[in-house]
Design a protein with these regions (language model features):
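N-terminal leader/auxiliary helical segments
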Residues: 1-77, 82-216
């Protein structure tokens, strides 16, 4: 079956899974014990990434899920994120430098990475003549995962990173990210940006700059 045809009605889900493990940053159900999950967001970008894809693809193949659209948008979304990061991040780091919390020499780069990503987002929107976009409707579909998709997510993260119940954790993280985008990030009139900028004046140089999260 043609893959493009099989997932044509899953565009929102594809966009959602193209965020890969980034939603794990918003796993605040348990602020302290959840730190392991929040750290996984970065670990999954830098450690055992090929192993994760290999484990996932083999599990899909061995269980005959290769024609399951819900499973396909998950793996294709994660691959899209991996390819984009691999291609774009070197350029972003080249332009903005790298902020390292324990290195005071890099404090001048604080927030620039996020600002550059927002700039590239806006550039792509302008290029495609898109004047308005609703992030929630564009890339969030928070329906419960199918049984097959739950199995794929659970197996892949357990096999690769030895973490249980990732199907539930990942969906929970998406829900919290969805709330965060609405409450703190969407800023069409730039009111939040002014508030964040004011707060940033009183925070230490190594603290993440809130202004970077404002998105209009």
């Amino acid at each position: 079956k043609n893959t493009k045809e099989s997932i044509k009605d899953k565009k929102r889900e594809l966009m959602m899974f193209a965020q890969s493990t980034d939603p794990l940053m918003f796993y605040l159900v348990s602020p302290i014990s959840g730190k392991k999950i929040r750290n996984l967001q970065h670990i999954a970008h830098t450690e055992k990434t090929n192993e994760f894809f290999s484990n996932t693809i083999h599990f899909i193949k061995n269980n005959n899920y290769h024609n399951n659209p819900d499973v396909l948008v998950f793996i294709y979304g994660f691959i899209c994120h991996f390819v984009l990061d691999s291609k774009v991040h070197p350029y972003i780091f080249y332009k903005t430098g790298e902020f390292i919390k324990d290195d005071s020499k890099t404090y001048k780069y604080n927030g620039l990475h996020h600002n550059m990503e927002s700039y590239l987002d806006n550039h792509m929107l302008k290029k495609h003549n898109i004047t308005k976009i609703n992030l929630k409707k564009f890339c969030f579909s928070l329906k419960p995962f199918t049984k097959e998709l739950n199995k794929v997510i659970s197996y892949s993260f357990l096999k690769t990173y030895n973490i249980n119940n990732m199907d539930k954790i990942y969906l929970n993280s998406l829900k919290q990210m969805n709330f965060f985008v609405t409450a703190f990030r969407l800023d069409p009139h730039k009111y939040k940006s002014h508030i964040y900028r004011f707060i940033d004046k009183f925070t230490p140089p190594k603290t993440f700059k809130l202004e970077a999260i404002s998105y209009n």
